[in-house]
Amino acid sequence: MNRRKQIKGCLVDGPLALDNAVSKEAAEHKGIVSDVAGDCDVILTPDINTGNILYKSINFLGGGVSAAVIMGAKVPVVLTSRSDSEKSKLMSIVLAAAMD
């Protein structure tokens, strides 16, 4: 969608290893030149299992708040975990509504 100019004002790059996506220093150390490296707003994963590992790591190890939505169906699918906070569940609903 980005290549077709359907997403305006958006920088897309990848694949990037997680450290390069979230750490400009790691990307520079590895010689990766990217406007996105170290400053990403969205991390896409190749499948639900990888996404689940990343999602729970951010929440439980990093103390973050995440939103989870599955794309590719006719409408976005909200996917939350029973252990998610109320805020995470709300952010998932908001993200899905914004994507529809």
Model-assigned labels for residue ranges:
Residues L54-S57, G64-D100:
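C-terminal functional extensions of proteins
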Residues M1-D41:
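Active-site rim loops that border cofactor/substrate pockets in soluble metabolic enzymes
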Residues L11-P15, P46, M71, L79:
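General beta-strand structural signal in soluble alpha/beta enzymes
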Residues A17, I48, R82-D84:
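Short, ordered loop/turn segments at secondary-structure junctions
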Residues A26-A73:
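A C-terminal functional module that forms or caps the active site or interfaces directly
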